[in-house]
Curated annotation (Swiss-Prot):
Carbamoyl phosphate binds at residues 51-54, 78, 102, 129-132, 263-264, 291. It catalyses: carbamoyl phosphate + L-ornithine = L-citrulline + phosphate + H(+). This is Ornithine carbamoyltransferase. Its EC number is 2.1.3.3. It comes from Trichormus variabilis (strain ATCC 29413 / PCC 7937) (Anabaena variabilis). Keywords: Amino-acid biosynthesis, Arginine biosynthesis, Cytoplasm, Transferase.
Length: 306
């Protein structure tokens, strides 16, 4: 996929609809076809936030492509002692071929990308989680064959996952509904970006009514009510978000063949019930596996593989 060769992925808005579809197609191919990088490459993981799926799936993806991985814990690098991001970026570019960053501020990610002359991948920020949404779209595509025209409903906190879902669905030609409590809506700038991508051809609905949002949806999605860094707010958020739990009752309002997604980790009994996450409509484990395949496709496209 020559179009992404050497490029950053800081946001799903960096992709065109065609590039998104080509990435999903390549991810599907890589489930049964082996590719190798054109020469031995090194991926650096610079993660300031805890990670299970993102860390392991990026590591395995790079190994399966024939590359190597260095796990750069910020706490044992000079970043933790105040070395400027721009200095760190200009050093790491001389050792690495690609850098995946998981951090709090989107601006820190953007600064790395500005100063490092190697590709930089957003492995999660407080604003966006693009790699997760690539896996979500691949999962929906596997379940419904075609995703254009489908409706995805997200219920819960208008966080980084909700932001990236709006962009991803707009690129994929899907309708997206975001149901949040008042005051917890997605980032307004990302909403505007998604609306510009959709260009009136698909629906982007923001509502405080989870039942309205769920009616007729083919994909029902949720995430934790308090993201990393918001743990102190968890007790205050619980009563506010309780009406936004994905339960069997809420799921019954969706299409009969609707699937349920959750980016994990899940707090059973909070944003989703045990019955739903373990139920017949849950595709959560397929979704988690697909992190490996979409990130392998992304690395192969950015670094070049054959």
């Amino acid at each position: 996929m020559a179009a992404l060769l050497g490029r950053d992925l800081l946001s799903l808005a960096d992709l065109t609809p065609t590039e998104l579809q080509e990435l999903l197609q390549l991810a599907t191919q890589l489930k049964s076809q082996q590719l190798k990088l054109r020469c031995n490459k090194v991926l650096g993981l610079l993660f300031s936030k805890a990670s299970t799926r993102t860390r392991v799936s990026f590591t395995v993806a790079m190994y399966q492509l024939g590359g190597q991985v260095i796990d750069l814990n910020p706490n044992v690098t000079q970043v933790s002692r105040g070395e400027p991001v721009q200095d760190t970026a200009r050093v790491l570019e001389r050792y690495l071929d690609v850098l995946a960053i998981r951090t709090f501020e989107q601006q820190e990610l953007a600064t790395f990308a500005e100063y490092a002359k190697i590709p930089v991948i957003n492995a999660l920020t407080d604003l966006e989680h693009p790699c997760q949404i690539l896996a979500d779209l691949l999962t929906a595509q596997e379940c419904f064959d075609t995703i254009s025209g489908l409706t995805l409903t997200y219920v819960g906190d208008g966080n980084n996952v909700a932001n990236s879902l709006m962009l991803g669905c707009a690129l994929a030609g899907m309708n997206v509904r975001i149901a949040t409590p008042s005051g917890y809506e997605p980032n307004p700038q990302v909403v505007a970006q998604a609306q510009a991508i959709a260009d009136g051809k698909t629906e982007i609905l923001l509502t405080n009514d989870p039942e309205l949002a769920t009616k007729g949806a083919s994909v029902l999605y949720t995430d934790v009510w308090a993201s990393m860094g918001q743990e102190a707010e968890a007790n205050d958020r619980f009563p506010i978000f309780q009406p936004y739990q994905i339960s069997e009752k809420l799921l019954s309002l969706a299409e009969p063949n609707a699937i349920v997604l959750h980016c994990l980790p899940a707090h059973r009994g909070e944003e989703i019930t045990e019955e739903v996450i373990e139920g017949s409509q849950s595709r959560v484990w397929q979704q988690a596996e697909n992190r490996l395949h979409v990130q392998k496709a992304l690395l192969a496209s950015i670094l070049g593989a054959e």
